[in-house]
Amino acid sequence: MNNSGADEIGKLFVGGLDWSTTQETLRSYFSQYGEVVDCVIMKDKTTNQSRGFGFVKFKDPNCVGTVLASRPHTLDGRNIDPKPCTPRGMQPERTRPKEGWQKGPRSDNSKSNKIFVGGIPHNCGETELREYFKKFGVVTEVVMIYDAEKQRPRGFGFITFEDEQSVDQAVNMHFHDIMGKKVEVKRAEPRDSKSQAPGQPGASQWGSRVVPNAANGWAGQPPPTWQQGYGPQGMWVPAGQAIGGYGPPPAGRGAPPPPPPFTSYIVSTPPGGFPPPQGFPQGYGAPPQFSFGYGPPPPPPDQFAPPGVPPPPATPGAAPLAFPPPPSQAAPDMSKPPTAQPDFPYGQYAGYGQDLSGFGQGFSDPSQQPPSYGGPSVPGSGGPPAGGSGFGRGQNHNVQGFHPYRR
């Protein structure tokens, strides 16, 4: 609808509509007083729910007086309040409370005939309020404030009387008993009646405000990605930059990569490792001890590495150990008695999926080993010479040839 001054002629403002009232029912009701050329119900833009009021325009402006003379009006079980829409410039000063409520200081001739009613019971409607306050004078308007989201009264409203004497009689009692509940009643003062201190924020500034850059610089820093890490005290460190001397962060979710695969050099170890056999140096069957590098540590200098095998690099983060293939030799003659040293090199262990240097330890001197369970005796003890190993627990490799008559 156009809100120009000429378009206001013949138009009615209808307040107090029920939430279920539609434009069709509103038009049908007022059609009994004359031809309705336009009808609209104001709705909330967000929820598309009725706001409780609307406008009706008649083709004949005289129909407005007929509607006002036929009060009260009831639609969909609710009392409605139709009022003429007078152009703003044609309203008399007394009937323009909006300007007195919004602008300028309060004066004697800007007093409003409106009272504020607070603490209204939830089961009290506009009809009950009108019936109660009409004993103080002629009630011209009843406005209850509703919650736009919950679509229910907020517990307060405004009553407008025809004269100021009725307002004085109503506010003589500060508290009124309405439907068994104590209700506060006081004169409704214009919005700017009280002096406002300089610099004090207005009513429109008390709403929710969005503070720009609320993070104060925190939001300007991008979060670390998977290829980045966190330095000391939670500082962000770009990808590839050293973090506290630990080198560049590994790829992935921050977890170090698994040790390089030792194909055909590492034996499958059950949970907890093999128990060390008696008679062998301590730590022989212990699980490998890895350092912060990416490969196993080199063997101690006092232990024997397999012949022909280069020592592993001692630099942390070096490439995986690479052993040369074992020399091809014929199998030992099982009919010959064992000698002091095996007649095949230690590189033969590669065929059994083992390499003791990968565990960080090797064999001790065969002549200094104590006897073990089921193992051959050392030279000088009356038994055949040892081959550097026995047949105790946890051993799944063969150091020397097997003889069927030696146990």
Curated annotation (Swiss-Prot):
Annotated GO CC locations: cytosol; male germ cell nucleus; nucleoplasm; nucleus; protein-containing complex; ribonucleoprotein complex
UniProt superkingdom: Eukaryota
Biased composition (Basic and acidic residues): 91-111, 185-194
Low complexity composition bias: residue spans: 280-294, 364-379
Reported modifications of this chain: Acetylation at Lys-150 is predominantly observed in the nuclear fraction, and may regulate nucleocytoplasmic transport.
InterPro entries xrefs: DAZAP1_RRM1, DAZAP1_RRM2, Nucleotide-bd_a/b_plait_sf, RBD_domain_sf, RRM_dom
N-acetylmethionine PTM positions: M1
Distribution of this protein across tissues and organs: Mainly expressed in testis. Expressed to a lower level in thymus. Weakly or not expressed in heart, liver, brain, placenta, lung, skeletal muscle, kidney and pancreas.
GO MF term (any one): RNA stem-loop binding
Pro residues: bias regions: 247-262, 295-315
Statement: the UniProt record of this protein carries the keyword Repeat: yes
Bias kind Gly residues: ranges: 380-393
Residues annotated as transmembrane: none
Compartment annotation: Cytoplasm; Nucleus
Comp. bias regions, Polar residues: 195-207
Sites of Omega-N-methylarginine modification: R253
Gene3D superfamilies named among the record's database cross-references: 3.30.70.330
Residues found modified as N6-acetyllysine: K150
Domain RRM: 10-97, 113-190
Entry-linked PANTHER family: RNA-BINDING PROTEIN MUSASHI HOMOLOG RBP6, RRM DOMAIN-CONTAINING PROTEIN
Self-association state and partner proteins as the record states: Interacts with DAZ and DAZL.
Function: RNA-binding protein, which may be required during spermatogenesis.
UniProt name for this protein: DAZ-associated protein 1
Species assigned in the record: Homo sapiens (Human)
Gene name linked to the record: DAZAP1
